[in-house]
């Protein structure tokens, strides 16, 4: 085994030579912030809460500006042992900014002490900071002064406590037995009653009373347990309030009680249609922490499975969109067609929707005999079938008239709300992580990135997904014809058990193997980050290791969360029927939103 790989895990990057660091020094001075060395791959800068808004404004307005607030969340640092490079801090709030123009990121961190965990809101700078700040307060109790509506967003309104704090229990057995009394039931029902005045919404204008309508949480066009409270003037939507959290299962909290390996099955279920696509950012982030380099065969196998699941998810999206507009037949065709993809996935992984097949350092096992024939049959059949969807439904004049120009927004609006994926590319912005920040060997493949003509509307979004399927087919053909030989797992002590004969000769090897199998591998203390182009936009994992067998903090940034936050800004002034079409064009599942 290559022992140098283990040593590389201690290597840290401070990105001091990054141009943005020099710009910050020239503008603010080098005494106003400190740089943290991590394995994230982007500059990480600590600033005070008094300065955070000035830094955000500067970064957003400078040339090659960071126009997108990609993520915002928190960390409870109180139980963290490895604090090298950290200031005095009990809680951290981090702001992850993304510049499409310069294809670069920067992370700003604000340290907070337990006596005063508050800082000013960034909602006046980035519109999408609203939900992220609400989630951070919900999970950690961190207060954002000046926020327009700092209330629960993931947890129920009556919830007590902040679940991602380290002193909050992580198991049901650590709580008192749950008893639902009549009084508590009435309290819960009352907390779900929509009170317009709490949201700053008026009951009427100077001449008419508004009607309030609950859309969901069990409406078929809501695509999951999702509620939108509509303020209506007749059929026109005056305003609306999306209400999420019904699908929340605490997947980030679960990571704190699972080993690095045993957490992999949970990643499948964050966006339950994506399968192996969701495993990719997690295993890549762990491999970055541990300094593991996987064989070429592993990279191509991972890409092959990811593109199979991308096609599978896109077929469901396209067919359900057609159903939302009024066409019933394609949805039944799609479920039949998707089974062909599941048959290939099952033959390779042994499972269908949630394979949990990627491993830290490789995949669970090698490709089975005959995999290439199964994939070839699928690729020979799929292109003509895709054209059938286009000609029969997507080019239909009724569908086009109900889709074109509906729920449209510009590139500027998309960046402001943190939109990624096909919805962003439909505005004309050519940004696909597989091309611009290639991972797992995507830079060795030839494929194009479909881009829209400047305005993202319902029709352009769905048609881009059609073209993305064509490009995924192109990638899969290259996997079929150019699959490298070699091992399916890295020869690394954190990923691969030692040969049996070695364990019989060296007791230390057997002990190490026993501990890794029973307790799990110990990943070096550090922080890492990995984003990927998932089925619905950019998905990423931000991992913090404290040098233990489990993650200290796992932050999962999903694309659907900001996409639903954008709904009110897009749909105001439209009809309820347009809302149905718009929701169908977003491509989301609530597990991806609520996590």
UniProtKB/Swiss-Prot annotation:
Membrane association type: Peripheral membrane protein
Which keywords fit this entry according to its UniProt record?
A: Cell inner membrane, Cell membrane, Membrane, Multifunctional enzyme, NAD, Quinone, Translocase, Transport, Ubiquinone
**Could you tell me which residues belong to the region NADH dehydrogenase I subunit D?**
209-595
Q: Which SUPFAM superfamilies match?
A: HydB/Nqo4-like, Nqo5-like
The molecular function terms in GO held by this entry are:
NAD binding; NADH dehydrogenase (ubiquinone) activity; NADH:ubiquinone reductase (non-electrogenic) activity; quinone binding
| Sequence segments annotated as region (NADH dehydrogenase I subunit C) | 1-185
Note the Pfam families from the entry.
Complex1_30kDa (PF00329), Complex1_49kDa (PF00346)
Its family remark reads:
In the N-terminal section; belongs to the complex I 30 kDa subunit family.
The record's subunit annotation is:
NDH-1 is composed of 13 different subunits. Subunits NuoB, CD, E, F, and G constitute the peripheral sector of the complex.
Enumerate the PANTHER family for this protein: NADH-QUINONE OXIDOREDUCTASE SUBUNIT C_D (PTHR11993:SF45), NADH-UBIQUINONE OXIDOREDUCTASE 49 KDA SUBUNIT (PTHR11993)
This protein's name: NADH-quinone oxidoreductase subunit C/D
Q: Which gene encodes it?
A: nuoC
């Amino acid at each position: 085994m290559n022992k140098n790989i283990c040593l590389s895990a201690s290597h840290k990057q401070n990105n001091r030579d990054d141009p943005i660091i020099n710009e910050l020094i020239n503008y603010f001075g080098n005494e106003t912030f400190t740089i943290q060395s991590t394995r994230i791959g982007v500059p990480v800068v600590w600033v005070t809460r008094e300065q955070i808004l000035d830094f955000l404004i500067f970064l957003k307005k400078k040339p090659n500006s960071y126009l997108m607030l990609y993520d915002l969340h928190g960390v409870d640092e109180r139980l963290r042992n490895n604090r090298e490079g950290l200031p005095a801090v009990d809680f951290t709030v981090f702001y992850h900014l993304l510049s499409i123009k310069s294809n670069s990121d920067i992370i700003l961190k604000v340290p907070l002490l337990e006596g005063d965990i508050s800082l000013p809101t960034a909602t006046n700078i980035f519109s999408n900071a609203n939900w992220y700040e609400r989630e951070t307060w919900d999970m950690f109790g961190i207060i954002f002064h000046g926020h327009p509506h700092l209330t629960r967003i993931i947890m129920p309104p009556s919830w007590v406590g902040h679940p991602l704090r380290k002193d909050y229990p992580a198991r049901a057995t650590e709580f008192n037995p749950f008893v639902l009394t009549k009084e508590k039931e009435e309290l819960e029902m009352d907390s779900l009653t929509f009170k317009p005045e709490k949201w700053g919404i008026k009951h009427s204008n100077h001449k008419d009373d508004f009607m309030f309508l609950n859309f969901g949480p069990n409406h078929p066009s809501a695509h999951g347990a999702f509620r939108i409270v509509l303020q209506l003037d007749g059929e026109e939507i005056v305003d609306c309030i999306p209400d999420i959290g019904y699908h929340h299962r605490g997947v980030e909290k679960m990571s704190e009680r699972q080993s690095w390996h045993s957490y992999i099955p949970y990643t499948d279920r964050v966006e339950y249609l994506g399968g192996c696509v969701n495993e990719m950012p997690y295993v890549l982030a762990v491999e970055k922490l541990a300094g593991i380099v996987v064989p070429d065969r592993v990279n191509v196998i991972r890409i092959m499975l990811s593109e199979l699941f991308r096609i599978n998810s896109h077929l469901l999206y396209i067919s359900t969109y057609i159903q939302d507009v009024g066409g019933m037949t394609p949805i039944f065709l799609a479920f039949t067609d998707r089974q062909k993809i599941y048959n290939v996935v099952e033959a390779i992984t042994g499972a269908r929707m949630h394979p949990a097949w990627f491993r830290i350092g490789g995949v669970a096992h090698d490709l089975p005999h005959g995999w290439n024939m199964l994939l070839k049959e699928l690729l020979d059949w799929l292109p003509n079938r895709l054209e059938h969807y286009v000609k029969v439904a997507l080019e239909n004049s009724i569908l086009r008239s109900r889709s074109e120009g509906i729920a449209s927004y510009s590139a500027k609006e998309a960046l402001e709300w943190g939109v990624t994926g096909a919805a962003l590319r439909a505005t004309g912005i050519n940004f696909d992580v597989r091309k611009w920040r290639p991972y797992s060997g995507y830079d060795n493949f030839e494929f194009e990135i479909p881009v829209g003509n400047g305005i993202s509307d319902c029709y352009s979004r769905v048609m881009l997904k059609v073209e993305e399927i064509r490009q995924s087919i192109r990638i899969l053909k290259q996997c079929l014809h150019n699959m490298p030989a070699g091992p399916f797992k890295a020869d690394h002590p954190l990923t691969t058990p030692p040969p049996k004969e070695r364990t019989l000769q060296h007791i230390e090897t057997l002990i190490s193997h026993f501990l890794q199998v029973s307790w799990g591998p110990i990943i070096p203390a550090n922080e890492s980050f990995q984003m990927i182009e998932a089925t619905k936009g950019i998905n990423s994992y931000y991992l913090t290791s404290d040098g233990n067998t489990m993650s200290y903090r796992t932050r999962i940034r999903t694309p659907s969360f900001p996409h639903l936050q954008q709904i009110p800004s897009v749909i105001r002034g439209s009809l309820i029927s347009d809302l149905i079409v718009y929701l169908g064009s977003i491509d989301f599942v609530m597990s991806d939103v609520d996590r």
